[in-house]
């Protein structure tokens, strides 16, 4: 993923926070030597605005590299501390949109699993409760729209997380028989060249200084979302 001008992806900015629409294909942080990541691009942007000053950018949360969506950063340590407290206490709320392949067991539901991460393969899997190293994962999903393709039924879902585990949405949905379109890790047998259809489409926070509730939304740009009418699910951008 190549970003020509990071300013094209900035949704909101003031003296305390900076909010971006992270495109799919770029890491939020530490992508490795020679690889571009969003943190580095934004630090360069801040440095150009404030010549002679060391740029500060606090990473509050991350999205997986193939996932697009809203990401908030802090522009000073005080704002970072306030936002981190919100993250720890569950006050920062994220709403995801996803496209799944195959039939659904209903129009909405709750998934509750125990997930264990494998650091060697950078994957997670559902295991039995009580498995060493496993963590409880809970999410809620709701059907928004369905479209029938030549090969399969596809569904646009709204997903809300109660917990935040490694690859949680991707693992739980695949384990429940509702794999995400384009997921090469957890739905490889049905994945062609389509990108992963997962977007953190809405983010709600309290401003770290004023306490004002703020909500940011983005319209998914991924190919798999284009078959659906997004007008009723996110504000037009």
Can you annotate each of these PLM segments?
Residues 1-237:
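RNA pseudouridine synthases
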């Amino acid at each position: 993923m190549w970003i020509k001008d990071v300013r094209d992806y900035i949704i909101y900015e003031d003296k305390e926070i900076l909010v971006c629409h992270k495109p799919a294909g770029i890491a939020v942080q530490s992508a490795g030597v020679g690889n571009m990541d969003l943190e580095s691009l934004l630090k360069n942007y801040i440095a150009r605005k404030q010549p002679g000053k060391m740029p500060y950018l606090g990473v509050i949360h991350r999205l997986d590299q193939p996932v697009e969506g809203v990401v908030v950063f802090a522009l000073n340590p005080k704002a970072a501390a306030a936002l981190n407290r919100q993250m720890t206490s569950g006050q920062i709320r994220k709403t995801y949109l996803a496209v799944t392949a195959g039939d659904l067991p209903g129009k909405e539901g709750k998934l509750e699993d125990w997930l264990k991460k494998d650091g060697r393969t950078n994957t997670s899997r559902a295991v039995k409760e009580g498995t060493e190293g496993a963590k409880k994962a809970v999410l809620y999903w709701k059907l928004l729209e369905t479209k029938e393709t030549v090969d399969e039924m596809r569904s646009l879902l709204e997903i809300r997380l109660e917990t935040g585990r490694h690859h949680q949405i991707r693992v739980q949905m695949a384990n429940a028989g509702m794999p995400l379109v384009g997921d090469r890790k957890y739905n490889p047998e049905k994945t062609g060249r389509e990108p992963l259809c997962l977007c953190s489409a809405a983010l709600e926070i309290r401003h770290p200084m004023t306490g004002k509730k703020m909500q940011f939304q983005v319209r998914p740009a991924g190919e798999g979302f284009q078959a659906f009418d997004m007008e009723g699910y996110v504000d037009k951008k």
